[in-house]
């Protein structure tokens, strides 16, 4: 909370936040003196000041409340602004399936600057529902959020994004509704989201229909169609991925059972000869694992990282021009009685803050692309090793395992924020007329361009080094994990062979087990 307060003080250029006197500073603020871009921060500070006495003593604590008090924490801004997060336990058919619903801060929220938190939900959630409204035009923050969705969409195994246009009942005709949906579709495609799944709904009409048990009205509301598609996604598409993974595991178990049955069918002499061959081959098998562990993927990773970050710098450079036009705009820098120097300072701060967020989102998306790249490299090397070993005898039943988990490296926030001092550039702004109708705005942009490029390069180079080092280490860990897996398969197989005692009962049991495994695998394949 203190960090959020300090950040809003910085955005509004009202000095540094001090706990002993910040309330006095906020009480002196006048709405008419606040630039348009800072109004959400002004509202936040007003709400925080109103609730400080009641809530500041609870900072850092966890509270358990009933539903009535929960409503107050959500609806009353002077309490809600103090809450970092809420876990609501609510029983309904959806949650009883084990589904957890997460409501993230809106794109225009002051908390939207925490790009890393939002990115983790994009990356790790099973489904994403983006809700917009019938009469809502996409803001700059909306467009930035959607652009991030567009960057990461192609990295997922399934299309898990659903776009809902709420309040569809406001449409005066089906033609008008179609035009609105077409506009949303165009905006999403512009953001890089190909083939978006868009569902116009009236949540109000749907709720009324649900309560009345009116299936016809529920269908007209559009909600029934969305619910049907979403249920199919949860029950079939996601379940299909899990079923396919389970089927692969069953298949590997089946191969091991078959291998054991084959060993049981051999005579004692044949098994002894096989064990002797194992002892002879164990050394070469271990040597091949040493080679796998020693595979150097760093040149490819470093090259890929460099290329990706280079393109990030190019896109950020282009974004800086668009954002500059937006923040140094006549609507924000008017002579309307306000403090023009403060307005100029806020415009410069917000431009750099917006650009910083753009850079952070680009770098986070780059981390996801690198995950997929390194994952593919590890799988490639494991596949090559497997192909080499599969032609040699004797060998256990070998298969490539999935590399476990990817943590996102720390990118940081505010990478560019506060890098420029507005006083160094105030001379370019003589007055609004000269700035916008004359050469002032273009001259300022040119003056900022070179130092900005240097800043972006410095940050990008530093993050590039971080990403390269991180994913090179992850590649080493991945190959080590894969080699350990192959080594364990050998150990388990050899222990099985040495422990076999020929038994008709065991053979019959294994044959029956193999049959059940094959049947279960087939059933799971059908689901997937």
Give the label of every model feature segment.
Residues 1-96, 149:
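Mechanochemical coupling/switch segment within NTP-driven translocation systems
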Residues 1-32, 36, 82-84, 96-127, ...:
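Non-catalytic alpha-helical scaffolds
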Residues 89-90, 117-118, 150-152, 188:
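Catalytic micro-motifs at enzyme active sites that drive phosphoryl/nucleotidyl and oxygen chemistry
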Residues 90-92, 105-108, 167-169, 205:
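Short, flexible loop/turn elements at secondary-structure junctions
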Residues 107-110, 124-144, 165-176:
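Conserved Switch II/interswitch segment of TRAFAC-class P-loop GTPases
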Residues 138-155, 178-182:
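Amphipathic helical hotspot of TIR/SEFIR-family domains
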Residues 161, 168, 179, 183-185, ...:
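Catalytic core segments in nucleotide and nucleic-acid processing enzymes
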Residues 173-178, 212-216:
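Short, flexible/disordered intra-domain loops and linkers
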